[in-house]
Design a protein with these regions (language model features):
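Conserved polymerase palm-domain catalytic core
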Residues: 3-17, 54-58, 63-66, 70-242, ...
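Duplex nucleic acid-engaging cores and interfaces of nucleic-acid transaction enzymes
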Residues: 34-42, 86
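Active/ligand-binding-proximal structured segments within catalytic/core domains
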Residues: 39-47, 150-154
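Charged boundary/loop elements
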Residues: 45-58, 397
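A conserved non-catalytic segment of reverse transcriptases
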Residues: 127, 132, 236-307, 314, ...
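Non-catalytic, peripheral interaction segments enriched in hydrophobic/basic residues
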Residues: 314-369, 373
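Extended C-terminal regions of large enzymes
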Residues: 342, 354-442
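Histidine-centered nuclease catalytic patch
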Residues: 440-458
Length: 458
């Protein structure tokens, strides 16, 4: 029977692939077979709704309807509105390779996943042979469909432990909780009462294994750093990288989170006369250099096409890359200056290599370029196609995840569908990377329709 075949499944060896990292090292990926991926997807669809109900609100990585933008918005809120200017930076050493299998299965049991057949399937999957390595005793392979969910399960205990130190700590007196129209609960009276105690104020924001703990005082940050290091070792068997971990005073230094460096700068004064601070953020130095190098690669590809169609594809690939960078980094407050610096640095190469192909007019602008870049005087055309200007970008304040959005409730799905009334920008990027040069225009919207997120959800 099918049930029996699932119970007796034999996991195939996982293919191991090393991909290069920006620092010159490599990241190991475990690539399961097609059949194993199918089974992992089935298991994921069973487990994810259960786990989602138990995850912490500020766990933003690898979760439906959440993104890096939501994590950055949460950090901005704590830094600027709450005045938490001391950050505990902790880098877990080889997180995915050091997850303890026994501990993970116990955490799943505690979260409510108590089907022993399912747990035995997961146990067998974790112990599946890895090509050229053998049978692992710990770790979950990066590259598996279910690995991100399991990573969140492991660190969910950390989220709630940090939360229990301040945010959700029980009090003797029950203070009123205000519910905003969007569903957000405000516990301001509780937190004001807690500030009069000796408790250490701390808030966690996490995206996958990258997390920040924000504190009001340096003394609290020092204690939290030591306590978190000990807790990770004792509870999860994980070590930290001392050279990548520490305490950052945002008034003096940057902290890096998800490719964005963040600090505060003094601006004006508060009502009580104390100095006011505002968030100041931009691309990390690593991301800045990577973008400059990538733009130069795209420029060379546009300068030496095999034919006109190949040149048009190179322009589309360039536009897709720049648009993706703009969409991600526009939530950095200082991104306009960063983009203009990069535009200035690559301007000479763009002019030198593409001068004979460049014009000030060309084909009709696609709507997505016309809306965002149509008013730019930096707009140029290469091979008749518009070239997105790197330096034309305005900051956009990051948004929080709407409370009502939830894939697993009818009301939440209705909210999701409201935002899908137009084509998602990721689809446009896909179409730009793979333009259909030899077909009629009428075919392209059909392809978009089949790939639209709304159809994928149905």
């Amino acid at each position: 029977s099918q049930c029996g075949s699932i119970r007796n499944i034999s996991w195939q060896p996982v293919r191991r692939v090393e991909i290069p990292k920006a620092n010159g090292k490599t990241r190991p990926l475990g690539i399961p077979t097609i059949m194993d991926r199918l089974i992992q997807q089935c298991v994921l669809q069973v487990m994810e709704p259960i786990c989602e109900a138990k995850f912490h609100e500020r766990n933003n990585g690898f979760r439906p309807c959440r993104s890096a933008e939501h994590a950055i918005a949460q950090v901005y809120k704590f830094v600027q509105r709450s005045g938490l200017h001391f950050v505990v930076d902790i880098d877990i050493k080889g997180f995915f390779d050091n997850v303890q299998h026994g501990k993970l299965l116990k955490q799943l049991w505690q979260m409510g996943i108590r089907d022993k057949t399912l747990l035995s399937i997961l146990s067998a999957m974790l112990k599946a042979e890895v090509a050229e390595i053998g049978f692992p005793e710990r770790g979950t392979p990066q590259g598996g469909i279910i690995s991100p969910l399991l990573a969140n399960v492991v660190l969910n205990e950390l989220d709630w432990w940090i939360s229990s130190q301040w945010e959700t700590i029980p009090t003797h007196h029950q203070y009123a909780v205000t519910i905003a129209p969007n569903g957000t609960a405000s516990r301001g009276k509780t937190y004001r009462a807690l500030q009069s105690t000796q408790l250490k104020e701390c808030w966690i924001v996490r995206y996958a294994d990258d997390f920040k703990i924000l504190c009001r005082k340096r003394s609290d940050a020092v204690k939290l750093f030591a306590a978190t290091q000990q807790w990770l070792k004792a509870r999860l068997g994980l070590d930290i990288s001392p050279e990548k971990s520490g305490i950052v005073n945002l008034k003096k230094h940057y902290t890096e989170f998800l490719g964005i460096k963040i600090r505060v700068r003094q601006k004006g004064k508060k009502a009580n006369g104390s100095p006011g601070y505002t968030v100041y953020s931009g691309m990390t130095d690593k991301a800045y250099q990577a973008m400059k190098s990538k733009v130069q690669q795209h420029t060379r590809a546009m300068a030496h096409p095999a034919d006109t169609n190949d040149g048009s594809r190179a322009v589309d690939a360039y536009n897709a890359y720049v648009l993706g960078i703009h969409n991600y980094y526009r939530i950095a407050t200082n991104i306009t200056l960063d983009m203009r610096k990069i535009a200035f640095l690559v301007k000479h190469e763009l002019n030198a290599r593409l001068r004979r192909y460049t014009q000030k007019s060309g084909d009709k602008l696609p709507s997505y370029i016309a809306e965002r870049y149509g008013n730019s005087k930096m707009l140029r055309y290469v091979y008749g196609r518009a070239l997105i200007p790197i330096g034309y970008l305005k900051h956009k304040a990051p948004i929080f995840k709407p409370k009502k959005v939830n894939r697993y409730t009818p009301e939440g799905r209705a909210e999701i569908h409201k935002s899908l009334s137009c084509v998602n920008i990721s689809i446009l990027r896909e179409m730009m990377r793979n333009p259909i040069m030899d077909r009629s225009v009428g075919v392209v919207p059909c392809k978009c329709s089949r790939k639209s997120p709304k159809n994928l959800l149905n």
